[in-house]
């Protein structure tokens, strides 16, 4: 069973056009939904060479809830589009979609290394990906792009809501004692409470939940 990908738009556009498109697509993102009958979860990450301009996207599929590796799909190519804050998906999405096309199994939900609604125009890479795949996607970022939050306690499981322009856009979650927290936000077709619960379910003592930890290793070709 192959992952079905919608044809939302092409990639030949200026930054100004991309921003306008983000505002349009953000209206289609769903921040509602819960998951049931879960057996597979995917993690997705993209690695970039600092010298050659090449990128490598990796998607890993793990069994849920035991987190055993089921499948790895990679896609490599040139990333000539420079990184522009807020437009990350226009640099990384073509490689990501190619990697998803290579999957033989269909994940029930996806963890994406990046923002979802915690984005200036409410369309980070996790939300953009969710619209292409029409699947539940959770944004799980290692750093903040927008928003303010109250300090967290040191214990694993402590959290603080993330607000941007007085709107709740995500949650800052500490997944391991004494390490920097993760920035969780809705990507598509899932509510924030469910997203945070599933991220916590996927953690096994590391800062990153297992799907993203494996995706990071796969993108760097370490697994």
From Swiss-Prot:
Q: What is this protein called?
A: Endonuclease V
Q: Does the keyword DNA damage apply?
A: yes
Instruction: Tell me which domain of life the UniProt entry assigns to the organism this sequence originates from.
Output: Bacteria
- Name the Gene Ontology biological process terms: DNA repair
Site (described: Interaction with target DNA): 83
One Pfam family name is: Endonuclease_5
Give the main EC class: hydrolase
- UniProt catalytic activity: Endonucleolytic cleavage at apurinic or apyrimidinic sites to products with a 5'-phosphate
Q: Where is the protein found, in the record's own terms?
A: Cytoplasm
HAMAP family referenced in this protein's UniProt entry, alphabetically? Endonuclease_5
Which EC number(s) does UniProt give? Answer: 3.1.21.7
Main localization of the protein described in the UniProt heading: cytoplasm
Q: Which residues cross the membrane?
A: none
Which NCBIfam families does the UniProt entry name for this protein?
PRK11617.1
What role does it play?
DNA repair enzyme involved in the repair of deaminated bases. Selectively cleaves double-stranded DNA at the second phosphodiester bond 3' to a deoxyinosine leaving behind the intact lesion on the nicked DNA.
Any one GO CC term of the record: cytoplasm
Keyword DNA repair in annotation? yes
Q: Which family does it belong to?
A: Belongs to the endonuclease V family.
The scientific name of the source species is Dehalococcoides mccartyi (strain CBDB1)
Which positions does UniProt annotate for Mg(2+) binding? 45, 113
Needs which cofactor? Mg(2+)
Assigned keywords, A-Z: Cytoplasm, DNA damage, DNA repair, Endonuclease, Hydrolase, Magnesium, Metal-binding, Nuclease
